[in-house]
Amino acid sequence: MASATVDFGIGRILSVLENETLLLSGVHGEIDKMKKELLIMKSFLEDTHKHGGNGSTTTTTQLFQTFVANTRDLAYQIEDILDEFGYHIHGYRSCAKIWRAFHFPRYMWARHSIAQKLGMVNVMIQSISDSMKRYYHSENYQAALLPPIDDGDAKWVNNISESSLFFSENSLVGIDAPKGKLIGRLLSPEPQRIVVAVVGMGGSGKTTLSANIFKSQSVRRHFESYAWVTISKSYVIEDVFRTMIKEFYKEADTQIPAELYSLGYRELVEKLVEYLQSKRYIVVLDDVWTTGLWREISIALPDGIYGSRVMMTTRDMNVASFPYGIGSTKHEIELLKEDEAWVLFSNKAFPASLEQCRTQNLEPIARKLVERCQGLPLAIASLGSMMSTKKFESEWKKVYSTLNWELNNNHELKIVRSIMFLSFNDLPYPLKRCFLYCSLFPVNYRMKRKRLIRMWMAQRFVEPIRGVKAEEVADSYLNELVYRNMLQVILWNPFGRPKAFKMHDVIWEIALSVSKLERFCDVYNDDSDGDDAAETMENYGSRHLCIQKEMTPDSIRATNLHSLLVCSSAKHKMELLPSLNLLRALDLEDSSISKLPDCLVTMFNLKYLNLSKTQVKELPKNFHKLVNLETLNTKHSKIEELPLGMWKLKKLRYLITFRRNEGHDSNWNYVLGTRVVPKIWQLKDLQVMDCFNAEDELIKNLGCMTQLTRISLVMVRREHGRDLCDSLNKIKRIRFLSLTSIDEEEPLEIDDLIATASIEKLFLAGKLERVPSWFNTLQNLTYLGLRGSQLQENAILSIQTLPRLVWLSFYNAYMGPRLRFAQGFQNLKILEIVQMKHLTEVVIEDGAMFELQKLYVRACRGLEYVPRGIENLINLQELHLIHVSNQLVERIRGEGSVDRSRVKHIPAIKHYFRTDNGSFYVSLSS
């Protein structure tokens, strides 16, 4: 993991030195000297590692690690110096001009002090650089250097890849179904060359599965020529061609050309084309990292009429999804199910007999170990092999309690570690930081997309790209980590976008170990041992900390934290906050904290504050001093009003104050807004405003906040209509708009709204006297929710042709007896029909809503039978009937009922009902 280590040292410093505040403030002379020397050091360290710093000798390894550790510590010092400088600059510039002369001496003193500190850092950098050069030229060091070699992890993994061709049967679990599917694709009758990509995270069994297929008799009989080529991460295309030629000739039992190693690129291509031109061949390219390989190699693999196939394994979804040609496809590897994982582990841990497991009472702890592997075949097999030598329950329990240590130190688990490090080292530097930051969260924690993105932005992990919003860049980072199988998507929203992620247990263990080694992240949990944990935090200075158990005032003594997360419901005291002046992100979501200390406002660098789902009732009075704050999330907290002076937080981008009214006794006031503070409309950079009471000043000036993309207002009154529409028409980037009237009889006057082209999600709660004329202009709309509209006319005609509509929710939206869906709604996947008290019939014409997957019918008591035409919805997966009439339910209950044949194609049908004993549901599926 040398590249990662260099990145976290010198790479971090170079990134920090791009800070624009510094460059604008007249101290860039020291910076230029730093950057030049650091670039030389970076090249030296990378070259040293390449020639022997990867573990070839103890001397080179220790020197390498020492130099990098020193530069990493300097990086942290520079970050702190810059933050301190930013504090002084802001204090000076924010003064009224009349007071600047008074504060000028203090500002100049601060600037001089910072320049001195940077000068001292420069001296330290020069000292480290001189030490490197001195040791590099020493005789002992030169003797220790070896000729250039490939990365140790990569070489080890390549050997394992080759050995997969000689798999043992007890390693093959859970492959029958995917094997049959893939062989069927390889043997398909299409004459053109087809590429089949097998994609999955490192250690998921891609290579084992592919090797089993490659060696199968059906494949051997079908193809004339075969080649298995393991692709080095730093491959040379000529070497790939030579390996391929050797494989083809060896499989054909033919003499390998004597001149092979003297041939150049063109001759190698010609020889391959000549050999394969009239043959049906299969090539397996194992462990492909980039699409660039295909661009280079495809010219040598003839696309003839004989049905040749290319199979490749990759960890990267971008590689698997590349357009390789007509008929090409990808197969995503699924992790092993619980029973399959147990079989594989048992085969390795108890090769003689499972009886040993039972007689020695090992099964409970063994199953816990298997559970930690979360279906990852490589981890299961490696751990099973290691445990096969351990006979006593105490030994097994020790391994379970120290699994993180075992992964990083036990030689028998080296392959697991090496494969994961290969994926990690391949990440660009910004993605390395973002990935390791995810190890802050507890194992199996559900990490939400927006939360991650905003925390990354607060830490300045997101590299600026001209013309692209930081949110979009961060989103691309997240997608890239998913494509590379470093994060797993565990929740998608109905619109096909990832909503929540998790990190595989094994990857999390390794990521956390790297984070601790790099003094980047640390966790304070049940594995932390009181004084030792405190000493670790104080002495090693990790920048980001997650507290996962109850903390005492003296349990954390670090002062240089940039992130503090509390992921525990235990009681916490905030005595440590006064010492955390460098904090950039404070996340207390779902913690037991009920009061914030006044010292919070001294955290000048704070950019992200998450108080959602806490018991906090108010923010400090001087909250406006947090001038760098970008995100404030008080969702589902007890905060009803923001403090005065909020308008001074000019950098604020996300203001999220949505609250549920837990004690409401009606179907209307279930959402509570936050009371608006004066001048809040002066927050010109605000992008998210969710959710606020509609008050006259805000409504009239809302149009000043032209960067808003998400707006949620409650307590809207009829007289707001014209001003509200005028303001909204000035905002051209709205993607989410939610308007709720003050009560269910108060009309929403929104006919004059015209700036609707950008809206993707629209929720209107309030009486509509007519269908807005602009409904049919919502060409980008994916969600439409109408609640309490009480329309006398059918709105369906105005929205049925909207091309991107995925989710439609009607809640007491229509007063007529008949709801008819004609041709249209071609992309609709979710339909909700709720509380239509006059509704007696729903008709779905043939061809309408062809893609519908979920249908909810709730509290429509007048509806006595399922929608006519429901039998035509062949993609419908779920039908939910909630508090509907007994007549409707009985018509589809059980075989032989009147309408049973119309719903028999639906996999899941559920009926929800209430009795005096509570709420229940039953399945009506066949």
From Swiss-Prot:
Originating organism: Arabidopsis thaliana (Mouse-ear cress)
Consequence the record notes for mutating L186F: Loss of function
Binding site for ATP: G200, M201, G202, G203, S204, G205, K206, T207
Domain NB-ARC positions: 153-467
Outcome recorded upon mutating L272F: Loss of function
Subcellular compartments: Endomembrane system; Cell membrane
Major subcellular location class: membrane
Phenotype for S439F: Loss of function
Name of the protein: Disease resistance protein RPM1
Quaternary organization: Interacts directly with RIN4 via its N-terminal region. Interacts (via N-terminus) with RIN2 and RIN3 (via C-terminus). Interacts with TIP49A, a protein known to interact with the TATA binding protein complex (TBP). Binds to MORC1/CRT1. Interacts, via its NB-ARC domain, with RIN13.
One Pfam family in the UniProt entry: NB-ARC
Family: Belongs to the disease resistance NB-LRR family.
GO MF term (any one): ATP binding
Effect of S43F: Loss of function
Stretches forming LRR repeats: 561-580, 581-603, 605-625, 626-649, 686-707, 708-731, 756-777, 778-804, 825-836, 837-859, 876-900
SUPFAM superfamilies: L domain-like, P-loop containing nucleoside triphosphate hydrolases
